[in-house]
């Protein structure tokens, strides 16, 4: 039987992987993927805890997080495509030229 601790350990590992990805990556696409891993780690923890306490509130909140993450990804990738067409780079360092314009 898989206990609550197992789910929380998986969520913590996912959160650490996402956090390391956010801090170490220079590519904006990988930065978006890392934030998605962070949000999914929170979802795993919310669903596991709400299932453990037989409360549906955490699962509903996880659905809201999924919807917000999808809209964030759509807007972010749209902006990223426009930035790539203009600058031909998706590195974080290329964003510093935005304040010069």
From Swiss-Prot:
The chain crosses the membrane at residues 2-22, 29-49, 63-83. Gene3D superfamilies: 1.10.287.3510. It is found in: Cell inner membrane. GO terms for biological process: ATP synthesis coupled electron transport. It is a multi-pass membrane protein. The keyword Transmembrane applies. It comes from the Bacteria. One of its GO terms (molecular function) is NADH:ubiquinone reductase (non-electrogenic) activity. It catalyses: a quinone + NADH + 5 H(+)(in) = a quinol + NAD(+) + 4 H(+)(out). The keyword Acetylation does not apply. Pfam families: Oxidored_q2. Its EC number is 7.1.1.-. Keywords: Cell inner membrane, Cell membrane, Membrane, NAD, Quinone, Translocase, Transmembrane, Transmembrane helix, Transport, Ubiquinone. It is an enzyme of class 7 (translocase). GO terms for cellular component: NADH dehydrogenase complex; plasma membrane. InterPro entries: NADH_UbQ_OxRdtase_chain4L/K, NUOK/Mnh_C1-like. NDH-1 is composed of 14 different subunits. Subunits NuoA, H, J, K, L, M, N constitute the membrane sector of the complex. NDH-1 shuttles electrons from NADH, via FMN and iron-sulfur (Fe-S) centers, to quinones in the respiratory chain. The immediate electron acceptor for the enzyme in this species is believed to be ubiquinone. Couples the redox reaction to proton translocation (for every two electrons transferred, four hydrogen ions are translocated across the cytoplasmic membrane), and thus conserves the redox energy in a proton gradient. Belongs to the complex I subunit 4L family. This is NADH-quinone oxidoreductase subunit K. It comes from Campylobacter hominis (strain ATCC BAA-381 / DSM 21671 / CCUG 45161 / LMG 19568 / NCTC 13146 / CH001A). The lineage of its organism: Bacteria, Pseudomonadati, Campylobacterota, Epsilonproteobacteria, Campylobacterales.
């Amino acid at each position: 039987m898989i206990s609550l601790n197992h789910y929380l350990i998986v969520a913590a590992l996912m959160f650490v992987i996402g956090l390391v990805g956010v801090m170490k990556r220079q590519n904006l696409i990988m930065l978006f993927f890392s934030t998605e891993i962070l949000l999914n780690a929170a979802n795993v923890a919310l669903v596991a805890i709400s299932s453990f306490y037989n409360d549906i509130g955490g699962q509903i909140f996880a659905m809201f997080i999924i919807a917000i993450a999808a809209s964030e990804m759509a807007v972010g990738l749209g902006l990223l495509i426009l930035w790539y067409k203009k600058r031909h780079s998706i590195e974080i360092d290329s964003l510093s030229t935005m304040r010069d314009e």
